[in-house]
Amino acid sequence: MARLADYFIVVGYDHEKPAGPGEGLGKIIQRFPQQDWDDTPFPQGIELFCQPGGWHLSRERKQPTFFVVVLTDIDSDRHYCSCLTFYEAEINLQGTKKEEIEGEEVSGLIQPAEVFAPKSLVLVSRLDYPEIFRACLGLIYTVYVDSMSVSLESLIANLCACLVPAAGGSQKLFSLGAGDRQLIQTPLHDSLPVTGTSVALLFQQLGIQNVLNLFCAVLTENKVLFHSASFQRLSDACRALESLMFPLKYSYPYIPILPAQLLEVLSSPTPFIIGVHSIFKTDVHELLDVIIADLDGGTIKIPECIHLSSLPEPLLHQTQSALSLILHPDLEVADHAFPPPRTALSHSKMLDKEVRAVFLRLFAQLFQGYRSCLQLIRIHAEPVIHFHKTAFLGQRGLVENDFLTKVLNGMAFAGFVSERGPPYRACDLFDELVAFEVERIKVEEKNPLKMIKHIRELAEQLFKNENPNPHMAFQKVPRPTEGSHLRVHILPFPKINEARVQELIQENLAKNQNAPPATRIEKKCVVPAGPPVVSIMEKVITVFNSAQRLEVVRNCISFIFENKTLETEKTLPAALRALKGKAARQCLTDELGLHVQQNRAILDHQQFDYIIRMMNCTLQDCSSLEEYNIAAALLPLTSAFYRKLAPGVSQFAYTCVQDHPIWTNQQFWETTFYNAVQEQVRSLYLSAKDDNHIPHLKQKLPDGQHQEKTAMDLAAEQLRLWPTLSKSTQQELVQHEESTVFSQAIHFANLMVNLLVPLDTSKNKLLRASAPGDWESGSNSIVTNSIAGSVAESYDTESGFEDSENSDVANSVVRFIARFIDKVCTESGVTQDHIRSLHCMIPGIVAMHIETLEAVHRESRRLPPIQKPKILRPALLPGEEIVCEGLRVLLDPDGREEATGGLLGGPQLLPAEGALFLTTYRILFRGTPHDQLVGEQTVVRSFPIASITKEKKITMQNQLQQSVQEGLQITSASFQLIKVAFDEEVSPEVVDIFKKQLMKFRYPQSIFSTFAFAAGQTTPQIILPKQKEKNTSFRTFSKTIVKGAKKAGKMTIGRQYLLKKRTGTIVEERVNRPGWNEEDDISVSDDSELPTSTTLKASEKSTMEQLVEKACFRDYQRLGLGTISGNSSRSKPEYFRVTASNRLYSLCRSYPGLLVIPQAVQDSSLPRVARCYRHNRLPVVCWKNSRSGTLLLRSGGFHGKGVVGLFKSQNSPQAVSTSSLESSSSIEQEKYLQALLTAVIVHQKLRGSSTLTVRPALALSPVHGYRDKSFTQSNPKSSAKEPVHNQGVWASLRSSTRLISSPTSFIDVGARLAGKDHSASFSNSTYLQNQLLKRQAALYIFGEKSQLRSSKVEFAFNCEFVPVEFHEIRQVKASFKKLMRACIPSTIPTDSEVTFLKALGDSEWFPQLHRIMQLAVVVSEVLENGSSVWVCLEEGWDITTQVTSLAQLLSDPFYRTIAGFRTLVEKEWLSFGHKFSQRSSLALNSQGGGFAPIFLQFLDCVHQVHNQYPTEFEFNLYYLKFLAFHYVSNRFKTFLLDSDYERLEHGTLFDDKGDKHAKKGVCIWECIDKMHTRSPIFFNYLYSPVEVEALKPNVNVSSLKKWDYYTEETLSAGPSYDWMMLTPKHFPYEESDVAGGAGPQSQRKTVWPCYDDVTCSQPDALTRLFSEIEKLEHKLNQTPERWHQLWEKVTTDLKEEPRTAHSLRHSAGSPGIASTNVPSYQKRPALHPLHRGLGEDQSTTTAPSNGVEHRAATLYSQYTSKNDENRSFEGTLYKRGALLKGWKPRWFVLDVTKHQLRYYDSGEDTSCKGHIDLAEVEMVIPAGPSMGAPKYTSDKAFFDLKTSKRVYNFCAQDGQSAQQWMDRIQSCISDA
């Protein structure tokens, strides 16, 4: 029996202690009983909870309120405080202040009857009967307010003395003595929560998804806060949420109603469920880690910082469906054609139970089989049970599931295990459900009707629990009169006579003592075990664990023990692969266990090695998240298997399997320990059957049954018998169990010593402080870090071994074991004496073990080493020397699957055993595949040292020795990755020496230390030029300081020096320019110093002679760009000349010695002009279009105001007085630009170019004013991700045969540069219309947007500025890193979504190529169309070089030859100063800058063009790969330095033929020429150039192809780019190719793509024929004929007939040889037909000349007649846009056959941009001119075409053609 109420309290307003403005305090007026009960202390702070919103006086008479507050005491017992609050008139106001009264202040005195103070009647109980308490308090209030003639003292005394029965379904009728009759109904089960209707109400308030989120939040220990305007609703919501957790119990702060004064509790770090009134919601919204539920608004707010774990599928979906069926039954029939009249919901009480039943089923499924994972540690005196979490998660298949992991680690689940773990206790509904009904739940999930039926069955039981007696007795409780609280004169609540109440309570208690106690005896039973744990998802058993694989493991073990070495070697690799499966690992432990039982544990050395390898392989995958079963099963085996090393010295297996992190995972040891203890306890009670000394332990079971009894079954029996045993017997049992646990603890301490103390104590890999960071897994980091940290602490003085050299190892092991012993022994109830004795034993065990291991270690080193593969010496290149001899390593796969067998098939070439070599040129691995079945193949992976981009130390799993090894991962810019694990024999010192040597050769002190100069010659000394003293003193000093500052990473001195040379404006602009000096380590002062007169080593005359021989000048002569002449000998026709003013590199350090400038410019003015450009890179001509006469110019970006400001300020006075230096520079620059512009225009006129004349289609008035500046660049990221369309202006520009042929020549050039491809809307903006009407400029200046933003240039200057944005260097570097990660990922990605193509797309590489090619194509098109181009982007040596060189390649066929491409690279890249050394990090000072593949991007762009136009290039793709490889290899001197000036300084610019001793390294071009002469290795057999306009490749991202250079690999000999230089007899992979004799030997050979060089193994037909001819000539002793002479003979014989101007060429390749291999888009016409005029009929067909595939229209035109019926009429019409109303010219075709009016961007366009169906045309009528129409157009030229959908507005060229169009269309409509 229990008291119904513990305390009754009256709490009122405290007038004496005001809390603050507008707020008061409450105080306890009376409490009953006055003394605390012994078992229940009086709750503190009850006055705060009576008024949670604060104590306030009121002006209104308010209704009485009731709510229940829950308080939790220090023992976690809950007290339910029911509060009934009413307001009574306040008579005495002397103690109050005006501020305390609610409402506004009013004038005059407040009448006493107008103020009301709250008073609360509180009932405190440990029982949860809210409705009974509401009735009792209501009754007391009724007696008071209605002045009933009943003593309040007797009511209170009866209430405090009333006793009610405990749970069990019994009823109790009672009365307080005021004419009431009340019934208390106790629930059937104490453990089941009582909810009434609160759960249904919560779902009604918040909805299914929100409640599920709150449910998951509470289970995963998040903070949950409710707020509502109702206190009772807060109580109900908290009660509901807590009840949904059943069978778990909430063990954190639970405060359904939180008072205002305690709001700071919300900031506590612990999880909670709290409710607050809505008036405080503004205060709680600032909480960052609290999930807030608004009960009144029906919403929940989950902060961003909280990752809310959700239920695992399929349970989440099933729960949602079940809840939906119950709460919204009408949803299922909502779509029925004939829905039922109404779908009845269950009444709220039953609905409440149905919802709870759903959650009960959910927990039954979630915890299915939990009892099979309980570990019994102790039975007596109290059961100690542990839950095997990892086993449960592993068997459920939810190891990775966040939700269940958090639930199992929570305090609620710990309580669940301790409460429900014991096998003999009272059972409830959940126990039955989880044991017997889970299978039924799973089966019924797919049948909603059966599921609902089961839910309702469970709901009935839950309902019956709360309402066990359906026929309840009549209840009567008087209620106050209606409106009684509004009475004017109500006396205050009377003071209760305390003595009388106390007396009555004592009398009632005395009566109850005599009554018999109606206590309910708890019925205990054996808890059913239930089904075993199964996976939550029904997964099909994978083939991985098939019977064949298990058989392989068994056979391998049999072969090992039978000493069948050959069979073992064959099966071992397959067995090791099979051990990745759990079943195979289990099979291994079972088989080894059998051999131990057969006393076959002594092994010879070979057997020992095999067994160790298999054990290591098995342990390799035992992570901390697995169930540890395998590692636990191997644990005793490691101490069983051993080999004899010497008499009395044996080596056990545990010494060789210590390198696995699982041995330092304390959770593993605990779990394994508990399992072992459980088995021992089970054995203890099973063996007791035959023990005569302990008769009470005998089991009354047949002999056959006791083996089947589990530990839990035995425990249940023991717990049942426990109360019947005598005290001595009980004590004996407790001692037996404790000794069992103690002995296991000693045993485990020994096992842990075995596995934690290393064989060589100087190499402790697991417990050394430096190790854990590399190998530990996340779950055991706490343990390992604490061990590692503890090494540094004071040593354990008890051990006595602190002064030995191994003391750190010994102490770290002792601490680890001591921590383990403390935890498991304390949990298992071992006495402190036993624990202390264990602590004393451990140091001795460790010390003895270390001593034993010293002998083992000594003897093991004397063993003959295991036969390892012989180290193969690598083949070296001429002049290459080995620096570091081979270090024995294991080459691991680099993340690509090709060489690993696996899913792609093929041999498993990797991992491979071999050696890592370092030579003066390469880092090189050579070895053989570890897989014996692959054969005797040699695996070679190498790359040049200079190409290394990243080198890092790694720790990796050595797959051969199955152990963790130190390793090295080296990445190369040649897209190779060497990832090796060092063998045990390689010491760390040797590895460090290797790395130091590697770094020494990676960043040599000077270029003469590189391999390019290492072919046996002496290092030439660098003789710095001597300068005149007067010029030298300050400059030399300054430069020295600046270089020193640059090394120290500071730029201050260089900037100060600049300040002295230039104005502050210029310097500040340079330094603060966005991106300036962020990524580039280029010194500000290095290339920007003012030119000085410098005297170089060579005399000026000899320098001039050598400069004239350079590629630059030869190309100027080829292009006819003027001659070298003084000012006096200028020839009139020349408007440009070649100046030698930079021959000593005094004008610009990064420019070539000879420059092309306007004839009118004096050399003396050039230095001042140069100052206006970054690094003095002034604008110079670099190429001329031989067809149009247009020029391409390049320069660095502008300084200061830039070119725009200069043009603008020509006629305006200077606003600010500047220095004479800037003034003169600005003036000279203005003159220079004016001369440049004049020369460009006149030059083009002299060339006879008609491109600047206005075309007839554009014969409109010029528009005065300024250019519209819409040529802007969008954000690189956003533009890259926009879909690129083939429509609109872009398509028209791209697909026209000549840009000039289209009237829309320069529409939207800027938009194209910005990456914006407009769709086929007829007019995108009015600015396009304006652009159309402007005449073409003579010069287009492509500059940075930031420099040209304010460009408003007068039209008279005849030039236009095109602002362009481009990718910065840091973006290029980042993209390259991502590209490398995609192509050589280093590890095979575990995430199936991270595919190669996705990674390639994420790298942003292709959008960057797209941007470069797009810019180059536009430049090329502008040049073709008669306008010159000046490119001045960034410093002028990165993107500028990419664009100018690519534009020249597209426009000039010469550069597409081998000799021409060399000229292009030498001129644009080498002479014009691309920073090769810096961008490729070749120099020592660019070490930290990162690799920027600017030149590689250019080569990739050339590769893209080559793909689309394979017949236009003399060289093949191998040539580009060769350059890509060697520009970073340092094999050649060509790409070593950053400018011609530096090359001249180092003496490598000119080959000094006179000095025989000073060899200056090898030039790549000479090497290429020799190779090209010797063989067609670089020749493109499809080469068949057509002398027409520039190439126009398709630059859409979708058209770009992945370059196979990034992914190809040749493991047989390494990259072929080094060996191809040598004669074929030196090829390392040609050795096996020589066939002996002409016998009938098979010529068949297996070709593996990742192993063999396919081009050599399977050459194309022509290469094969050439090699056959060479062999035949050799056999006939003839002098071999040069291959190109032979090729010319063949091609001459197959020449086709001469072509006429109108004939079409059908094949781009040579007929009979390659024409079939050329795709259709590569077959181009030799000469294009003349361009059509306006309104002309077309009578000839054209094939597209670009890289775009044939459109459907073109295919259609090939097969249909071209008579008037097909294209009856065509010509240009202006069409008005539907949306933006702009006029645009389009090429219209009237097609009678198809009854269509089609329109194109131009007459040559093959892609139809749209059509008008003539069937929809209603009329065609003349129209008047409208706004924005083309000027100078006749009013009669307009007509409208009205269709059923819209009206089209057209404008013809004149009235006559408009009438002609109307007639044609009208006749077409009439004919139809």
From Swiss-Prot:
Its job: Guanine nucleotide exchange factor (GEF) which activates RAB21 and possibly RAB28. Promotes the exchange of GDP to GTP, converting inactive GDP-bound Rab proteins into their active GTP-bound form. In response to starvation-induced autophagy, activates RAB21 which in turn binds to and regulates SNARE protein VAMP8 endolysosomal transport required for SNARE-mediated autophagosome-lysosome fusion. Acts as an adapter for the phosphatase MTMR2. Increases MTMR2 catalytic activity towards phosphatidylinositol 3,5-bisphosphate and to a lesser extent towards phosphatidylinositol 3-phosphate.
Superkingdom: Eukaryota
PROSITE patterns from the UniProt entry: DENN (PS50211), PH_DOMAIN (PS50003), PPASE_MYOTUBULARIN (PS51339)
Tissue specificity annotation: Expressed in sciatic nerve and in Schwann cells (at protein level). Expressed in brain (at protein level). Highly expressed in brain, heart, kidney and testis, and to a lesser extent in lung, stomach, small intestine, skeletal muscle, liver and placenta. Expressed in spinal cord and eye. Not expressed in thymus and spleen.
Name recorded for this polypeptide: Myotubularin-related protein 13
Domain PH: 1766-1870
Source organism per UniProt: Mus musculus
GO biological process, one term: autophagy
Xref: InterPro entries: cDENN_dom, dDENN_dom, DENN_C, GRAM, MTMR13_PH-GRAM, Myotubularin, Myotubularin-like_Pase_dom, PH-like_dom_sf
Keyword check for Cytoplasm: yes
Gene behind the chain: Sbf2
